[in-house]
Design a protein with these regions (language model features):
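Interfacial aromatic-anchored transmembrane helix boundaries in multi-pass membrane proteins
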Residues: 16-31, 56-90, 124, 134-135
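Membrane-embedded alpha-helical segments of multi-pass transporters/permeases
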Residues: 19, 63-66, 117-122, 148, ...
Length: 169
């Protein structure tokens, strides 16, 4: 029951946090506000719940608010589902130390970006377009550097604080 409640809170954060950057979409695509609650859900609740929240969040947010726009929300759903699943799985396997948190986080971020690129390539291919490697690098890494740094700084602090406070799902 706790996992359901924590997952629902993370999903709600996915819906609300982008409003902080919503007036300037470029800032939202740089700070990646939906990624943090998904990764946190994976850390707290495990890979299955993290994947469910990650896949649902961008699609639900698109249905409710029109953002992120189609077809980007589809590739984002696969990306965030991968984040939640991988970080939850690795965190359970590697333990709760700072090193385990960072390894889980970095591996999840790399896997999620790879899945995002594959999904973008598939979507663009279905629409008769192409998705060159330069677009992948720009979308997955170059424009996302501030969000990547934010995640690498904020999430280990949050996870350690919640673990020390005894928050467990």
């Amino acid at each position: 029951m706790k996992k359901l409640v924590y997952s629902a809170m993370c999903l709600a954060l996915c819906l609300v946090l982008p409003f902080l950057t919503g007036q300037i979409p470029e800032i939202g695509s740089m700070l990646l506000p939906m990624h943090i609650p998904v990764l946190l859900c994976g850390f707290l609740c495990g890979g299955g719940w993290g994947a469910a929240v990650g896949f649902t969040a961008p699609l639900l947010r698109h249905l409710l608010f029109g953002m992120p726009p189609m077809p980007g929300c589809i590739s984002m759903a696969f990306e965030l589902a991968t984040y939640g699943f991988v970080v939850g799985l690795l965190h359970r396997k590697l333990g709760k130390g700072v090193k385990g948190i960072y390894v889980s986080l970095i591996c999840a971020m790399a896997a999620g970006r790879l899945v995002w690129g594959i999904a973008q390539m598939a979507i663009m291919g279905l629409n008769g377009g192409s998705f060159p490697f330069s677009a992948f690098v720009a979308g997955a890494f170059t424009s996302a550097i501030p969000g990547i740094v934010l995640q690498l700084v904020l999430l280990p602090i949050l996870v350690r604080a919640l673990e020390k406070a005894g928050v467990k799902a």
